[in-house]
Amino acid sequence: MKTKIRKAVIPAAGLGVRLLPATKAIPKEMLPLVNKPTIQYIVEEAVKSGIEQILVIVSSKKTAILDHFDYDLILENALIQKNKLQEHKEIEDIANLAHIFFVRQKNQDGLGDAILFAESFVGNEDFAVLLGDDVVFSKEPALKQCLEAYYETNCQTIGVQEVDPCHVDKYGIITPEGDYKNKDLIKVLAMTEKPKPKDAKSNLAILGRYVLKPSIFKALRSVPYGVGGELQLTDGLNFCLKNENFYARKFTGTRFDVGTKSGFIKANLFTALNNKDISKKEVLELLNLVKA
């Protein structure tokens, strides 16, 4: 019987440089898609995928994230007094989503360094990782799709999608075994962090969803700092590949990189179009203003 994945890690200590000056005082993870912070979408995806415990890795300037997932008795009591019962339930439900823990990453030395901060939380259990910049809208949560692949293979699994071959230098790219065009589950031979288009072995990009084993921690302590002078998770995964099988799950869904200006705006428009409180006519009027 395969062990259920109960724990997930969400790295959220980044500086949000691409969204400055908005992120000077506000964590980028707290910037909203319409009226809900982006990190709440990530947490909700984890919960819908069966995750019970979540560790969010933050920096010293990210206390707003802690506050968001905590109870706010003053606000809740005020809503009750004003008979705003629906709003009260919505606020209370946020604090009850899951068992959420926090740890500070003292220096932002890369994704691999952030993952190392989760070692004591994870213990000897296999676990999931969700990156906060990658918001995915799909009927079946992207992480759940990756977990299904993990349960099928009992191997470390990464979520991928095909990207424009001209843009592979923005992502971690996998080297697949054989033809991958008509497959959803693909064996991984290697991974390369932000390769030049001419050097990429595929256009399958690693897009912020992982199911990992505790062996990743030893691997990350065994590899040198890589691209950008940071400890890269991709390098740790390649170290594991020497002794373990890896699979990539080509997940379905509409994915946005909300850590970029264009991705953040597109995600807001997509969310608005699917929000019951906002008519499509209103969104189209906004687009017409832009055209004018």
Curated annotation (Swiss-Prot):
Keywords: Nucleotidyltransferase, Transferase. The keyword Transferase applies. It is an enzyme of class 2 (transferase). Gene3D superfamilies: Spore Coat Polysaccharide Biosynthesis Protein SpsA, Chain A (3.90.550.10). InterPro entries: GalU_uridylyltTrfase_bac/arc (IPR005771), NTP_transferase_dom (IPR005835), Nucleotide-diphossugar_trans (IPR029044). Its EC number is 2.7.7.9. Belongs to the UDPGP type 2 family. This is UTP--glucose-1-phosphate uridylyltransferase. The gene is galU.
